[in-house]
Amino acid sequence: MDRQNIRIRLKAFDHRVLDHSTREIVNTAKRTGATVRGPIPLPTRIEKFTVNRSPHIDKKSREQFEIRTHKRVLDIVDPTPQTVDALMKLDLSAGVDVEIKL
């Protein structure tokens, strides 16, 4: 028999919001009777931007800014129909990007 898996991939700039959303998904899945693998932390993507501090002179004086993108992966093994319904109704934070693969 073919086992159905749901893979949920979460991305956010703030790791605290990401961990909170991950905990909500795990608790919802466990409450409805599904088994959960994860959350698995993926490597953080750091994107750096270097700009001149002064608009006129001092080329050597620069400032760096960075954006960190934190990622997590969850696998829900053998989800029940109640699990799918509960995950659809789940309201997550605005700063979290969610990708779901069946």
From Swiss-Prot:
Keywords of the record: Ribonucleoprotein, Ribosomal protein
UniProt xrefs under Pfam families: Ribosomal_S10
A Gene Ontology molecular function term of the record: tRNA binding
Gene Ontology, cellular component aspect: ribonucleoprotein complex; ribosome
Gene3D superfamilies reported for this sequence: Ribosomal protein S10 domain (3.30.70.600)
InterPro entries linked: Ribosomal_uS10, Ribosomal_uS10_CS, Ribosomal_uS10_dom, Ribosomal_uS10_dom_sf
Coiled-coil spans in chain: none
GO biological process: translation
Oligomer status and interactors: Part of the 30S ribosomal subunit.
Function noted in UniProt: Involved in the binding of tRNA to the ribosomes.
Family: Belongs to the universal ribosomal protein uS10 family.
Record-given protein name: Small ribosomal subunit protein uS10
UniProt organism field: Phenylobacterium zucineum (strain HLK1)
Organism phylogeny: Bacteria, Pseudomonadati, Pseudomonadota, Alphaproteobacteria, Caulobacterales
